[in-house]
Amino acid sequence: MSDRVQRPIRVLVVDDSAFMRKVLTELLESDPLITVVGTARDGQDGLEKVLQLQPDVVTLDIEMPRLDGYGTLREIMARRPTPVVMVSSHTREGAEATIRALALGAVDFVAKPSGSISLNMHVARDELVAKVKAAAAATPRVRTAAVELAPVSPREKMQALAGLRRQTGFGDRLPRRLVLIGCSTGGPGALHQIIPRLPADLPAGVLVVQHMPPGFTRSLAQRLDELSAISVREARAGDPVRAGQVLVAPGGYHMLVDAEGRIALDQGPPVHGVRPAVDVTFESVLPVWKERLVGVILTGMGYDGAKGMAQLRKAGGWTIAEDASTCVVYGMPRVVVELGAAREVLPVHSIADAITRAVGEG
């Protein structure tokens, strides 16, 4: 990375719209630390230029002819793993495709403000530049195992949940144990390595705070639910926190738990520059669950969640940080480790078992 400090970040722009290629190039090159070394009109052209130009970062449109963004990403990760920032639409189809791409190994995404050809793309300039710079410093991780999992039927989930409630008598009561997972850049891929490996009868509730804008967290929750034995969905105000269920904070809202054990959503100011913020959820749940809370911090930029993890460790709770060896961006977990707030530091593929073990003790 030392040479990247001295030279601009080399970016390849892949989009089937000539207008969007021009706009993205202008926006990126408005920053002196970025240079666009090439553009491609579709996925096949993009793949050839990745191999030819060997860029530091690729921006990749989701919807393209010949070879779409997802297919192109799969080939890039197989043939020359490169940090990729997806450029997607706000449509349901665009969100679903984006989540699949993030699960496969894309570093991050930028949503087009107004459809596939966005005349106002300039409003996303700062986000685009920041995410390309972050991607240049990221480590591309080829994620395949969770993506290939067979979907789990709703009937299997209901049977497992009914069995859990018979065994524990939880019903709608507050679960004895709670797991809070926080993540940012690279988080969707990490979550696809963890959530599908949790048992349907996990004797704990699970809350997930992923830094992500509105419109995409629902697709993330739906995709995880399809692949997982445990039930997963986007949290709604008033939802009870239950054992055997994963609730994902909706983009644009802080997620809290009220005195009755129900989800409360808050659009107060961003904390650490993000909303939802992991530390806001920590402040809400730590006084209730105390040492019965399990905190997990995964890949991501910044330090959100570190304060909550330090308080949880002090309270006697179990804390897990993702190891640098599997992080896309070793930021949030690094701060947790440096604070001495992690009881375990584990590669992502070991975290589901660690969670299951932690909530099964006491």
From Swiss-Prot:
PROSITE patterns: CHEB (PS50122), RESPONSE_REGULATORY (PS50110). One of its GO terms (molecular function) is phosphorelay response regulator activity. GO terms for cellular component: cytoplasm. It catalyses: [protein]-L-glutamate 5-O-methyl ester + H2O = L-glutamyl-[protein] + methanol + H(+); L-glutaminyl-[protein] + H2O = L-glutamyl-[protein] + NH4(+). Pfam families: CheB_methylest (PF01339), Response_reg (PF00072). CDD domains: CheB_Rec (cd16432), REC_CheB-like (cd17541). The keyword Transferase does not apply. It comes from the Bacteria. Its EC number is 3.1.1.61, 3.5.1.44. The keyword Hydrolase applies. Coiled coil: none annotated. Its main location: cytoplasm. It is found in: Cytoplasm. Residues 173-362 form the CheB-type methylesterase domain. Keywords: Chemotaxis, Cytoplasm, Hydrolase, Phosphoprotein. The modification 4-aspartylphosphate is found at D61. Gene3D superfamilies: 3.40.50.2300, Methylesterase CheB, C-terminal domain. Phosphorylated by CheA. Phosphorylation of the N-terminal regulatory domain activates the methylesterase activity. One of its GO terms (biological process) is chemotaxis. Involved in chemotaxis. Part of a chemotaxis signal transduction system that modulates chemotaxis in response to various stimuli. Catalyzes the demethylation of specific methylglutamate residues introduced into the chemoreceptors (methyl-accepting chemotaxis proteins or MCP) by CheR. Also mediates the irreversible deamidation of specific glutamine residues to glutamic acid. Belongs to the CheB family. Contains a C-terminal catalytic domain, and an N-terminal region which modulates catalytic activity. This is Protein-glutamate methylesterase/protein-glutamine glutaminase. The gene is cheB.
